[in-house]
Regions:
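Metal- or metallocofactor-binding catalytic centers and their adjacent structured scaffolds
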Residues: 6, 39-118
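Shared catalytic-loop signature of beta/alpha-barrel
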Residues: 212, 218, 229-339
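Flexible C-terminal active-site loop/helix
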Residues: 2-7, 12-16, 28, 297-363
Length: 363
């Protein structure tokens, strides 16, 4: 057994190529990337990370530095799940989600990376090893695009090798959403898988009304139609429409996921290892999803989630997100025959190119 001796944490503010807009989060001009490296007594280290939509990253960085680093120093690095559980309780009073879940996620991912490297096992293998690839869709943050630009953008995803796409909905006037959905379906043809994401911008009544209008366009799922913690509201929407529901990116604790499984009548769950508690929590959610007969999917950070989703027997879809974290790694996501391919190397397989990143180092 080797002990944790130190954490080194870095904060980066990474620009996007253009302003991206959805229904609830405002304008995205950049995203924040917080990377933490956990070192053990042998001098080996694992790398973990989390990200934000542009706000809160400095608070996450501070929590890692001030609260988590001294707490886990001296713990047995191999006891990854134990460290996760203890850190959750350590921060429970001020945490139970939010910033603490982001910070805990980064450390947990680093410890899994270290575990894999020391045991010569890939994350794919450690997470279950069911398959080496998974279905993937390209999701845009495109609510602010004109309709012609939206169609052009979605068409470019097909040129990149995807056979599934997702667009944002949630305009104040539902007729605008309907027109855009219709235009995209016409552009991509009847065979391409098509999802829509409202970023919880509708009420229950509005979501039901919108979904009934979307049904004409063969929508694979309706994502986050209403606020994520209205678990019974999801059930009300689900029983009234003929489109499957998906959500999970804004659930930050195992208890929230359990409520969603028990109450919300979802067909797809979308945990994000960057904010639900890391790989440990993501795998616990995956286990719950099998118990409740729900397909396990992901949100964001495709370079990591490709291993987790591929490894599951009930794998759904990998989201390929508009925040291109993998652009700053030595292995951007790979597609072969419309499928995303998991890396086959010890650890998580995510290795950052700090030469690229250091230009944006804000700490």
């Amino acid at each position: 057994m080797t002990k944790v001796v130190k954490l080194e944490t870095h904060y980066f503010k990474l620009p996007l190529d253009e302003i991206l807009i959805d229904a609830k989060h405002g304008n995205h001009s950049h995203f924040e990337l917080i990377i933490t490296q956990v070192f053990d007594q042998d001098g080996e280290f694992g790398t973990g990370y989390t990200y934000t939509g542009g706000r809160g990253g400095k608070a996450i960085y501070s929590m890692l530095q001030e609260d988590i680093a001294p707490f886990i120093q001296g713990m047995q690095a191999e006891k990854v799940e134990h460290i996760y559980d203890e850190t959750q309780w350590h921060l429970h009073y001020v945490g139970r989600g939010g910033i603490s879940s982001f910070a805990i996620s980064a450390v947990d991912i680093a410890l899994w990376d270290l575990r894999g490297k020391k045991n010569n096992k890939s994350l794919l293998t450690m997470a279950g090893g069911n398959n080496v690839s998974c279905k993937a869709y390209r999701g845009g943050i495109d609510l602010g695009y004109s309709q012609p630009k939206l169609v052009e953008s979605v068409s470019s995803y097909l040129d990149e090798g995807f056979n599934a796409v997702k667009i944002k909905v949630g305009h104040p006037d539902l007729s605008t959403d309907i027109s855009r959905v219709q235009a995209v379906r016409h552009a991509i043809g009847p065979e391409t898988v098509f999802m829509v994401d409202a970023n919880y911008s509708y009420s229950v009544k509005q979501a039901i009304n919108a979904a009934k209008r979307f049904e004409d366009y063969n929508i694979h799922w309706f994502e986050e139609p209403i606020i994520p913690d209205d678990f019974m509201g999801y059930a009300d929407v689900s029983k009234s429409i003929n489109i499957p529901l998906a959500m999970g990116e804004n659930l930050h604790t195992e208890q929230e996921f359990l409520h969603a499984f028990q109450m919300s009548n979802l067909k797809f769950i979308q945990p994000d290892a960057s904010n639900c508690g890391g790989i440990t929590a993501w795998l616990r959610v995956a286990e719950m999803s099998r118990e409740y007969g729900v397909s396990i999917c992901s949100h964001g950070m495709q370079e990591l989630h490709v291993s987790l989703v591929s490894a599951q027997a009930n794998a759904g879809w990998l989201e390929v997100h508009s925040f291109p974290i993998d652009k700053y790694t030595f292995r951007p996501l790979k597609l072969e025959s419309k499928l995303a391919i998991a890396p086959n190397k010890p650890g998580t397989g995510v290795e950052f190119d700090f030469e690229k990143l250091n230009f944006y180092n804000a700490t």
